[in-house]
Structure formats: structure tokens, C-alpha cells
């Protein structure tokens, strides 16, 4: 695949997207990755479609409505068999209006088309995987799909909506001993380029490291 990848690879970075509300340790991964690949890439500043934030905030509502549809034969008829977390999600689906769901679907289409247009300028987009280096289990359980989960979803939910392929690449260990990673996003149905770009970054970042547990 690498032989088919034209170099230098054009990598898009929205510096506001990768810094605002993001832990410095997570942003540092982006700087380190760019330094590691060196002349193999050309970094181009881009602007993410601003609708990504609304999609991150309300991803839980879309997920909840679609989950409710999937469980229509069993919920609420067999609600006693459901755990509290799933009940919370299903009830969120019941409380989300059809108008709000339709609005999010329209926003999904807009974001998808605007993001796809960026790939006429760059080969891949580079971003953190999450706004912190690596969350603990407790942090993830506390965030769940609730209103305060948007920061955890800002680098994942928008692409879940749009259908763009993403790839997480290990990027070493941070000073606290936690694993680091970066994320690459490519045009729809361009997994070949995505995997080739991932191989380039993975090779440049060196051998896989494991945290001491």
C-alpha cells in the first residue's frame, strides 16, 4: 500500500480543533507525530466544519432514538429485564422529538458533505483520538452518554455520523505512563489511503510501547 501513496502526504490539521478544550498532552501527540514523519508529509491548516460540535453534543440523542427503534419489540414491555444504563439511553430516545432527530439527520448530511470537500485539499486529517491522553475507566463511566460527554466524543461522534473512515495509531507512552495515540481521518471509501498513511505514521513513531500496569 505504501508504494501507492504519493509523497509528501498532505495532512490537514485544524489547530483550533486539536487545542481548544484539549489537554496539552493530547495536543502534543499531534506535534510529535508531525515532527516524527518529517519531510514525508506536508501539513496544511484546515477548518473543520463547525457543525461537528453540535453533533458531538447530541450524538447521544441520535444513538438513543435508533437504539429505541432496535428494542421496540422488547422495551418498555420488558423493561424490568433492562439495566439502568440502557434504560437511561432508551428513555432519552423516548424523550427526543421527531423534529430534533430529523434536525440532527439534516446536520449529519451537511457535516458529511462539508468534511468530504476538505479531502479535495488534503489526503488525510490528523487529530487526537480523545481530548485527554487516556481516560480512566471511572472517567468513561461518569461521562457515559450524558450531557457532559461531548468533550469525550468530539473526535469520534462526528465521524460516526458522517461515515468517514478513521484509524487510531499508537504514539508511545506519556510521562504519566499512559498510552498515547493519534487519529487519522480519510475521505469516504478511501481506506486504502488511510491505511497507507497510518503505516507511514506508525513506522515514523517507532516500535509499539506498552504501559506498565
Could you say what each language-model-derived stretch is?
Residues 1-19, 31-36, 40, 96, ...:
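Structural helix-boundary/capping segments
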Residues 24-47, 71-77, 101-122, 150:
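Acyltransferase
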Residues 42-59, 90-91:
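Short connector loops at secondary-structure junctions
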Residues 102-103, 133-153:
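Short, surface-exposed loop/helix-turn segments at secondary-structure junctions
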Residues 130:
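Short glycine-/small-residue-rich Rossmann-like dinucleotide-binding loops
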Residues 146-169:
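Small-aliphatic-rich amphipathic alpha-helix that forms the alpha element of a beta-alpha
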